[in-house]
C-alpha cells in the first residue's frame, strides 16, 4: 500500500504512520473488496476539504452520516496507533448533537487520554495531507504522553 500523489486535492501526499493507520482502519470496513483497486489517496480523499470548499459551506449545517463515519474512523485510527505505541487499548466515545457539535474522548483503562470538544462538524476535514497527518500525530503523541505520565491508571 503506497501513498500516491493527488496534487489537485491536498497537495503532496506525505508518508505518515497515522495516514497508514487511517487507511488500514477504512480498508478494514471493506468486507466485499470494493475498494481493493482504490489508491490510498482515493480512500482518504474525503478527508481533504480545500479552502475554497470550506468557504462554500454554510456557517451552520447538519453533518451527514458519511461525515460522522469519517470522523469516527479518524479517532479510531488515533486509538489504534496509541495502542500500538503503548500496549494500552484506547477506545473512543463520542456524543454528537444532530446540529454538529459534541465531544469525543479516548479512554485507556481508567484514563482519559484525548478529550476534544467538537463544533461545526459539518466542516470536518483538512486542507492538505500534511495537515491531516499532523493533526492525527499530534493527538496520538499527546495521548501517549498522558499514558506515560499516568501508566497505572491507563493499565487499570
Curated annotation (Swiss-Prot):
<protein>
    <recommendedName>
        <fullName>UPF0460 protein in nifX 3'region</fullName>
    </recommendedName>
</protein>
<dbReference type="Pfam" id="PF03270">
    <property type="entry name" value="DUF269"/>
</dbReference>
<comment type="similarity">
    <text>Belongs to the UPF0460 family.</text>
</comment>
<dbReference type="InterPro" id="IPR004952">
    <property type="entry name" value="NifX-assoc_nitrogen_fix"/>
</dbReference>
<keyword id="KW-0535">Nitrogen fixation</keyword>
<dbReference type="GO" id="GO:0009399">
    <property type="term" value="P:nitrogen fixation"/>
</dbReference>
Amino acid at each position: 500500500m503506497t501513498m500516491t500523489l493527488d496534487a489537485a486535492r491536498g497537495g503532496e501526499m506525505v508518508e505518515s504512520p497515522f495516514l497508514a493507520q487511517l487507511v488500514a482502519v477504512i480498508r478494514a470496513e471493506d468486507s466485499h473488496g470494493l475498494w481493493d483497486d482504490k489508491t490510498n489517496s482515493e480512500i482518504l480523499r474525503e478527508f481533504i476539504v480545500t479552502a475554497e470548499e470550506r468557504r462554500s459551506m454554510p456557517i451552520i449545517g447538519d453533518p451527514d452520516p458519511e461525515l460522522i463515519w469519517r470522523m469516527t474512523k479518524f479517532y479510531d485510527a488515533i486509538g489504534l496507533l496509541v495502542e500500538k505505541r503503548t500496549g494500552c487499548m484506547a477506545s473512543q466515545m463520542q456524543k454528537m448533537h444532530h446540529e454538529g457539535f459534541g465531544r469525543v474522548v479516548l479512554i485507556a483503562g481508567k484514563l482519559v487520554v484525548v478529550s476534544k470538544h467538537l463544533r461545526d462538524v459539518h466542516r470536518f476535514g483538512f486542507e492538505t495531507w500534511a495537515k491531516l497527518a499532523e493533526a492525527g500525530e499530534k493527538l496520538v503523541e499527546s495521548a501517549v504522553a498522558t499514558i506515560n505520565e499516568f501508566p497505572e491508571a491507563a493499565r487499570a
